[in-house]
From Swiss-Prot:
Originating species: Mus musculus (Mouse)
Domain HTH CENPB-type: 65-136
Protein's name in the database: Major centromere autoantigen B
Record-annotated HTH psq-type domain positions: 2-52
UniProt PTM comment: Poly-ADP-ribosylated by PARP1. N-terminally methylated by METTL11A/NTM1. Alpha-N-methylation is stimulated in response to extracellular stimuli, including increased cell density and heat shock, and seems to facilitate binding to CENP-B boxes. Chromatin-bound CENP-B is primarily trimethylated.
Keywords of this entry: ADP-ribosylation, Centromere, Chromosome, DNA-binding, Isopeptide bond, Methylation, Nucleus, Phosphoprotein, Ubl conjugation
DNA-binding region as annotated in the record: 28-48, 97-129
Sequence ranges of Low complexity compositional bias: 144-158
Modified sites of kind Phosphothreonine: T396, T398
Described purpose of this protein according to its UniProt entry: Interacts with centromeric heterochromatin in chromosomes and binds to a specific 17 bp subset of alphoid satellite DNA, called the CENP-B box. May organize arrays of centromere satellite DNA into a higher-order structure which then directs centromere formation and kinetochore assembly in mammalian chromosomes.
Amino acid sequence: MGPKRRQLTFREKSRIIQEVEENPDLRKGEIARRFNIPPSTLSTILKNKRAILASERKYGVASTCRKTNKLSPYDKLEGLLIAWFQQIRAAGLPVKGIILKEKALRIAEELGMDDFTASNGWLDRFRRRHGVVACSGVTRSRARSSAPRAPAAPAGPATVPSEGSGGSTPGWHTREEQPPSVAEGYASQDVFSATETSLWYDFLSDQASGLWGGDGPARQATQRLSVLLCANADGSEKLPPLVAGKSAKPRAGQGGLPCDYTANSKGGVTTQALAKYLKALDTRMAAESRRVLLLAGRLAAQSLDTSGLRHVQLAFFPPGTVHPLERGVVQQVKGHYRQAMLLKAMAALEGQDPSGLQLGLVEALHFVAAAWQAVEPSDIATCFREAGFGGGLNATITTSFKSEGEEEEEEEEEEEEEEEEEGEGEEEEEEEEEGEEEGGEGEEEGEEEVEEEGEVDDSDEEEEESSSEGLEAEDWAQGVVEASGGFGGYSVQEEAQFPTLHFLEGGEDSDSDSDEEEDDEEEDEEDEDEEDDEDGDEVPVPSFGEAMAYFAMVKRYLTSFPIDDRVQSHILHLEHDLVHVTRKNHARQAGVRGLGHQS
């Protein structure tokens, strides 16, 4: 079995050519075995000797990696980037992979290359094409990001002890499937949420983390900052960040520190620091005569004492819940912070100023404050809406909240009511069936009376049919509202197939009873006018399928809002009753029309 085929670099091919020229008396087969290549490959290399040597001179150091003359689709961009890279390295300054990517994006913008993204895969291929050696701690591999990664986030957020468990916080009960329920009755500007994240700094000055000739092993960046971010649901208030680190609190300059800073041995937000933060927030809310709800997650608050808080109610997300600010806000803050560091590094490299690569704690705090300020309020409100908290200015959270005991009692009551309703429904059905049988026997006897009284009774039948069989939208909407205890004042206009739906507050009159009486009088007048026509037009009766399709549309609209299980149960009961009534009325009306044709 011959040697395994592999593609040689230009440097390896040049070395083979040199070996052949230095040993003219050596057989070609012996040289092929020495380099573990087939004789045919050796013949091809010698045939293309001039082109191979030219390519080696062209690519220089990169010839140790390049195997073909195939150009990159971004060849012009990479030419400018490698020239800039060589200039910076000649000055003895380190260049990290993230800085290479940022510089490449700038060059692409100048060249108008909108499709260029500077991905990790491109960076890996760029290094291979141009012989850029990745030292430890810089561009690690194709599958890993070049930026340093913070440690894994701590375990799930703390849960609040129930009332009587010894905790100082009142007995909030939060359920994983309905985390916004605790915010019922609060305006969106009074619902705050806080989360903790990590940022890194002081890794730009690591001289050993350079590319292409780094002097020794790289030192991992160990300077980590824990940042507590807090904002309200409509994004109108972003509280100053609380930053914690291991370094001692720096001296404030003339303008002071841009955000609060606390130091401890672990570099995280401690219970004491959080208590002080909440106390300051409570004092501020007292001065503004406001009572707010603060939803927290991933905080060191298991043993937090909140007995002194009068204007701030604290609650926690259950484990496994995605925090509102973690739906995009935290990522934005990290992106703005990283961008600020890269811009600083780029300016230092292009100005060949090694001292510019030093990032101190005070400057890092300014970067944190600027990154938090750059987040748009609309983005914060969007993340809260995605988490189920509504959003928008002056909006009110209307989701329901009940304790476990209340929910169990309501479930038991609902089960008892359902059993009673089922029993009553069966009795009513039996009575109605008996009445229908008696009515069917008496219809033939009273047929002559119907003919004598005639058209007035027919108009009454048609009026009853239109009100019960037609299933008007206002009656359906009002019935659903009464069953659910009242929705908000929603009004939806359907332009095409369906009539206008007005969902009013439970117990509210639509336009007063006088309007309904006027409508009834107008219908009576129209029926009397139709009596003069011997071939009077019959009121069209919707089919059972049409009626149920209409109800399905209304049901979809109702269930698109956040409703509790009790309202859902009422909707199901209403659907059952409507099916029963519609079938009965449809059968009765068909029987009346059949008797009319026979007479």
